[in-house]
């Protein structure tokens, strides 16, 4: 008698995001596609040997200040290693070495150092991250002559529900300098995020994918001891595979609009504008232009 093989339906593995990425879908609708007051150029390319080069330059239209960064990255996939070199126009040099999934599955260790030749200032950081089903942990140590600072975070997820905690312990002061909580819920097209920072700042956001081409987001924040409540609504609509428009408005009557167009594969143009609705005739509005090149 032939054996009957019955396929086993495995439940998909759900790894929660790191604490910094909680509520990211809602924040992206507010932040991406806008660049008020800046003229920006980003260039990304990759050599035949696998070295990735990233260059970014921007000019602030208000102050006229020009800044730029250069980054090179090489991945040694066989050993799970990534080497990154960074430089910026403040003449700060950075080196980062990361190893992932080698010591154990889901563990990533990063060694990050920076050095400023002008001031002689040096800094070092060791980062660790561990992610498995239903859990995402992180612990970073900032080294300082006064004493290291320890940053820790943990996010737990179960059937769409997320709960996280983030802290910073300053060994020089021997006390917690940051203590944040977050609770959220997410599905394929809906995300809810709430957070409390240091017991004084309260925030929440909602992300909703209304349809395939239309995304919306709502953001609310309040600080205890003040009457200041911040509220905003944002939306993004994909006109076609190469173009999208974004818009947002907050309770301060600041209205932002953005238009992104892929001119050709690897070339993307973004135009944006910020209008102050309270003083429309007084000026002070901002424009932005960004060009991204990738090859």
UniProtKB/Swiss-Prot annotation:
> Which UniProt keyword terms apply here?
Acetylation, ATP-binding, Ion transport, Isopeptide bond, Lipid transport, Lipid-binding, Membrane, Mitochondrion, Mitochondrion outer membrane, NAD, Nucleotide-binding, Phosphoprotein, Porin, Transmembrane, Transmembrane beta strand, Transport, Ubl conjugation
Matching InterPro entries: Porin_dom_sf (IPR023614), Porin_Euk (IPR001925), Porin_Euk/Tom40 (IPR027246)
Annotated GO molecular function terms are: ATP binding; ceramide binding; cholesterol binding; oxysterol binding; phosphatidylcholine binding; phospholipid scramblase activity; porin activity; voltage-gated monoatomic anion channel activity
Q: Where does NAD(+) bind?
A: 254-256, 272-276
The record's subcellular location field reads: Mitochondrion outer membrane; Membrane
After translation, the protein is modified as follows:
Ubiquitinated by PRKN during mitophagy, leading to its degradation and enhancement of mitophagy. Deubiquitinated by USP30.
| Residues found modified as N6-acetyllysine | 32, 121, 278
| Phosphothreonine PTM sites in chain numbering | 119
What does the record say about tissue specificity? Highly expressed in heart, kidney, brain and ascitic tumor with very low levels in liver. Expressed in the head region of epididymal sperm.
Keyword Nucleotidyltransferase, does the record have it? no
Residues with the modification Phosphoserine, per the entry, are 252
Q: What does this protein do?
A: Non-selective voltage-gated ion channel that mediates the transport of anions and cations through the mitochondrion outer membrane and plasma membrane. The channel adopts an open conformation at zero mV and a closed conformation at both positive and negative potentials. There are two populations of channels; the main that functions in a lower open-state conductance with lower ion selectivity, that switch, in a voltage-dependent manner, from the open to a low-conducting 'closed' state and the other that has a normal ion selectivity in the typical high conductance, 'open' state. Catalyzes the scrambling of phospholipids across the outer mitochondrial membrane; the mechanism is unrelated to channel activity and is capable of translocating both anionic and zwitterionic phospholipids.
Assembly state and interactors?
Monomer, homodimer and higher order oligomers; formation of higher order structures is necessary for scramblase activity. Interacts with ARMC12 in a TBC1D21-dependent manner. Interacts with KLC3. Interacts with SPATA33. Interacts with PPP3CC in a SPATA33-dependent manner.
Any idea what this protein is called? Non-selective voltage-gated ion channel VDAC2
Q: Specify the species.
A: Rattus norvegicus (Rat)
